[in-house]
Amino acid sequence: MSVHSGSRQLLIHGLMLVLVGLVWGLVVPNTPYPRLALGAHIQFVTNGMLFIALATLLLAVPHRVGRTSVRVMLLAVWLTWAMALSEVANAWWGTTLMLPLAAAQAGPTGGAAWQELIVKLAHIGAGLGLIVAWSLLVVGFVKRAPDQG
């Protein structure tokens, strides 16, 4: 996989995250915990825009981001999908441990232990993945691009 093809994959993921978020927005009022469903909608759209921006930078601006870094970024986008989908499930589960502020507003009593674990692991993985991906992006742009000597 080249940096260019990986960047296109990131762009497609970003576009799909936004699309899924927009469609999911139609479902939000029909879930047991609409406030938690709204959180999933926001995660899809916001993270989709984040990956669109990341991919656009990689495709349009000179940089020194390598193939390995792009692979890490692709892992981060897959972890982001897992996190956003865990929030979709949470609109029915009503877990409270990982997102206590949203849960306090939504009023759930908590999910089963396995549900709480899925939501927790998905959020931790995506959070760490996003931090690493953006750190690699920053480093790749701070280094001088090959044509800038």
Language-model features, listed with the residues they occupy:
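Eukaryotic low-complexity, intrinsically disordered regulatory segments enriched in serine, proline
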Residues: 87-107, 120-124
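Membrane-interface interhelical loops and short amphipathic "cap" helices
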Residues: 26-42, 98-114
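N-proximal short alpha-helices
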Residues: 9, 16-18, 54, 104-111, ...
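Juxtamembrane membrane-water interface segments of multi-pass membrane proteins
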Residues: 1-9, 27-36, 53-74, 90-99, ...
